[in-house]
Each structure stands twice: as C-alpha cells, then as structure tokens.
Amino acid sequence: MRIAMKIGLSALLLGGIGSVASASDAPRFSRFSYDGHTQEQAKVGPNQYRNPILSGYYPDPSVTRVGDDYYLVLSSFAHFPGLPIFTSKDLVNWTQIGNAIDRPGQLDFTGMKTSQAVFAPDISYHDGTFYIVNTCVECKGNFVITARNPAGPWSDPIWLPFEGIDPSIFWEGDKAYIVNNRAPAEPPRYDGHRAIWIQEYDWRAGKMVGESTQLINGGVDLSKKPVWIEGPHIFRKDGYYYLTAAEGGTSVNHSQVVLRSKQLRGPYQPFADNPILTQRDLNPGRRDPVTSAGHATLVQTQNGDWYATFLAVRPYEGDYYNIGRETFLLPVTWKDGWPIILPKGKAIPFVASKPRLPAGRPGPVPTSGDFGYIDEFDGRTLAMQWMGVRTPRAPVYRVEGGDLVLGHGTPIGDLTGAPAFVGRRQQHHNATISTTMRFAPDADGDRAGLVAMQSDRNYLFFGVSRTAGKSMLSLYATDQGKDRLIASVPAPTGPVTLTIRAMGDRMTFAYATTNGERTLATDVDARFLSTKAAGGFVGTLVGPYAWYR
C-alpha cells in the first residue's frame, strides 16, 4: 500500500502557525542541532542491521503488515502530538509518517502527569481501514481510532466500556475480538495479580458485544505469584491460537511469555520453556547490557518468516537510563510448535542479520546507530518528531522567518495546561544538543532556554532568566519538584548559543556568543533525569522552553 507522508505538525498542533504572543521580546530560537553516539561498539555488515531499530523513547511497539508494508505504533503517554506512526519495507529502516493523536479535540491531557494518558497502543488492519485500540489512563479509559491512511487523519476516539489496559484486536474472518489486561475474576491474591480477558468487538457498530472471558489468571503459573501479565496479543497458526504477553513488570524482571489453545476462548496451555524473551537471568555486570526486555508483538513476513518487535533499555550503569525504553527487532524461531524470540541465557544482540525482504532505505530522520540532525526552523511548522507536554488549549509557538517563536504557556509542573515547550527525544546517552536563542527578559521570573525534561518534577533548565532585576544565564536542576541553582553568570546581550553535552550520567553546559564559547558547568550529575530516579515510563525530551509575562 502506498501512503502519503505528513510533512509536519498540523496547523492546530501546539498552536501550529496560529497566533502566539506577538510582543517583540518573545523568545526566538533560530537553530536546533543534535549529534548522538552509541555507548556500545558494534560493527554492522552489509547484510546486517543494528539494534535498537528505534533509539530512545519509543516504547511498547505494536507492528502489523499490510501487503509488503509494515506499520508500527508506539506509546507516548501525556506528550502531544502522540502515538507516532512509522512505516517500513524491511522491518529495519523506519520512517515516521504521522502521529495518530495530533488534534487537541481528540484527547484532552489537561491535569495529567507526564507518564499518564496513552499507554501501549495496538495497530491492526481490516477491510481497508487501520485500527488503533488504546487506553487513556486518567482519561475515559479504552478507545478505538481509525484511519483509511495510516499517516492520518485518524478519527476521534470511540470509547469502549471495559476496564483495564493494554488492549489489542485479534481479527478472525470478519469478526474482531479485544484482548486486554484486567483485574482477575477472583479477588487479587497479591500486588501485581492481573488477568487477561477477551470480548468480541463489533467493528461496524463500534461497540463491545457478548460476554467477557478470562483467558489467563495471574500469568504462566499462578502458584509462583507472577506479576503484571499485560500487553497481550493473539494470532493463529497451524490450528492453534497463540497468546503472547509480557510478564514480570516493566523493569529488570520484564519478560515475554506464550500460551496456546485449540479454542479462541481457551483453555490456554503455557509453553514449558517460558519465557520466550528475557534478560533477567544474565549477569548484571556484563558490558553494555540490554535489560528490561518484553512487551513484544510478533509479525509474519510475506515470505513466511516471523519477527518480533519489543522494548528494552540500555542503561549506562545499574538500572539508570535517561533515554527511555527503546524498540528492538529479533527473528522468531519455531521449535515443536512454539515461538522463541531469544533462547534463555542469551544476550540481545546489537547486530543481527537482516530479514529476507526487499532492501529498505533509511528514512529522512535517522533512528538507529550514531546520527545527528539540524533543524533550521525554515518550514511553515515543526517536524512531526517534536512534542510538547499535555494538550495545548491555545497556541504556544509559531514558526516564522527561520525562527521558532515561543508564546505563553503554563510553567513546567503546572498540570492545568501545556507549557511553552517543544522537545525532541534524547536518543543517545552520549549526545550534544545545541540551540541559538534571542531573548531579553522584562520581569523577574521570565525565562527562556533549553530544558531537558524527564517529568514535570524532574528536569533541567539552561537559559536566560531575570532575577532581582538582573538578567542571568543560569542552570537550574529540578529534582522531585525542588529547584536547585547549579551555576549562574550575567546574561550576554544578543544571540547566545546554548549547548548541552551528555555523557551517560554526567552533563556539561556551555554557552557561546560572538566572543567564543565558555563553559558554565561541568560534571553535572544527570541521574535524576533517569527513569529510576524520576519514576514513570518515558524518556528525556530536550528542547526550547519559555515562560514570561
């Protein structure tokens, strides 16, 4: 299927090219650059690919095939636009073609924390229409959106009255069934005791029909108190219904398990050699570990081969990682009628053989390995990779004359609205990120610069602010909502280039004017920007931010 690719955010997105503050002192950003390098060393041959296939904050991948084309959707939580959609010909080279949630009217994230809102989407295709079924946590619950073109536009949500999270659609002939994580039929025996349920979905009427059936209680073996069975998917092969799901929680005990049945509604028997994917049994002190692997989706190629997309993380030490959960790809082997993504005790490889598919081309925006890019803000609006936090009620930016101009938003941490912040994912632990800014604050508290944000309570601000009547170039760390001034100097006049150099758990901050570059702070501990320290499920975004009167 041929599709049209969106060239940027819609006019409504984050205010788009609509009206924002027209004051002459509005912060203006004229350039944004990113240069990232992997911490692991890996040589990629001509018939090989590199993991992860999507670097940085791209969790909970769901993949489907339509003809010779593959489509992928991922979680985005309270970031907006959300639910990024990618396409590929070879499962290796991916190009973003849109965001399924790209209009303020689709979902309202007001009042939500960064790691709330849209969790674990599932994408499928039937009778000329693409379907995404998803959960909006702290919103209205589970919903379906549809599109004839996966690049969009996607419909407004159709809300579905069932509880739980992580729904996916299984299609059998002209019937559809939704399988998801819910509370067990019995009172929970322990924390993390969940169940997998199935119910028919009338896709023509957009409603649930019939009775719900519990397929899995607790996990593979209830006597061992398995936790957080979730992210279920069903597919059929050789007369069996296979149910795969994540088990163990999203941290280092994460895994993927599989069960099968001759009947759709069970009973399901677990694979004797579960899990079919995990890294929890490996030496935690190994070099360049990949951990927390799970939440897989299996897909069959047009050649009959099987592959799995799944999430995992690359910590820089222990369980510390700032860049979020990433998307990996591995072949699936079949043994005695059971799928295996990775044998027990094996480490996820950074390099693997390419699928037997027509050669794909790298997309215009790199997603894997070492890469960089520059945004000169020379279009009519921002590229679709930019995201804000929560759904904007009013415009917070415009793009004009080669500048990104930020308007008025709420302060970071104020959940009642969207801040004037647009960011890109930090996709490498070793990265250099720069922007050039012009801003003269008028009142105490006014500020503009670069923000590295893991959550509403854990972020760094590096830029120009006004304090006690003086314009200062300052670096602030906000950890669990508490601000700490790290360094400050009188702000230079005129344009200033702000540069963040990330090196694992450390960051260096420099600024440059026509008089050259100077360092403001070195060896700044950045572990508070990790998921372990901040909590939640997202990765760090870095980009321009402003708050001013």
What are these language model-derived features?
Residues 8-18:
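Bacterial N-terminal signal peptides
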Residues 1-9:
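Bacterial N-terminal signal peptides that target proteins for export
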Residues 24-549:
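Carbohydrate-active catalytic/glycan-binding domains of CAZyme proteins
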Residues 19-23:
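Sec/Tat signal peptide C-region and signal peptidase I cleavage site
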